[in-house]
A protein has these predicted regions:
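Domain-level signal for soluble alpha/beta catalytic cores
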Residues: 1-178
Length: 178
């Protein structure tokens, strides 16, 4: 597993090279340990995902590319989730999809568009919280049943009431195989 580096800057090519070195180092350790595949996840820049994907494929490993889309339905540079996934498929990703930030319902909304756009395998790994159209990501979610949370933001210490139960997660899993 490799994730966003938090140093990628689309306007600074030196950060692209630094990201490449970071990914190559992590992936070399994974390959030495005998992994079969690498998941690049929680990345919301398409260009950063390209760097991670190249490092995975250059190592001769199966590549899973899961974008994190915190708001709206676009990557940081403005690609729709489905277009970003299609770009990764076209560049050789074996599996594309979405993870993090969004709960099951909001993740599924985007996954359906991804499924229509790509022919490779699709992955969906939502966070287990009840995110909504108004608050699609759990980092900025509010608990409307409680007005005593400092600042009003449930993340990171007051998410308990927003947690999906096992039946909600089972429904997401069932929807994935439809």
């Amino acid at each position: 597993d490799v994730a966003n580096t938090n140093i990628f800057d689309p306007g600074d090519t030196s950060t692209h090279k630094e990201c490449q070195k970071m990914y190559e180092e992590q992936i070399s350790w994974a390959k030495e340990a005998g992994v079969d595949f690498v998941i690049a996840e929680t990345i919301n820049w398409t260009e950063e995902m390209k760097i991670a994907l190249k490092a995975i494929k250059d190592a001769g490993l199966i590549a899973v590319c899961n974008f994190a889309i915190p708001r709206g339905d676009k990557t940081r540079e403005g690609h729709s989730a489905e277009d970003a996934c299609k770009i990764m498929e076209d560049l050789g990703a074996d599996v594309v999809g979405l993870n993090c930030y969004r709960g099951p319902e909001m993740t599924m909304k985007l996954l359906k568009k991804v499924r229509e756009k790509v022919s490779c395998h699709v992955a969906g790994l939502p966070v287990p919280y009840r995110t909504t159209e108004k608050e699609p990501g759990f980092l900025n979610i509010t608990d409307h049943g409680c007005n005593c949370i400092p600042g009003g933001n449930a993340f990171p210490v007051a998410l308990d009431n927003l947690l999906c139960n096992r039946f909600e997660m089972a429904e997401f899993a069932k929807d994935c195989v439809k």
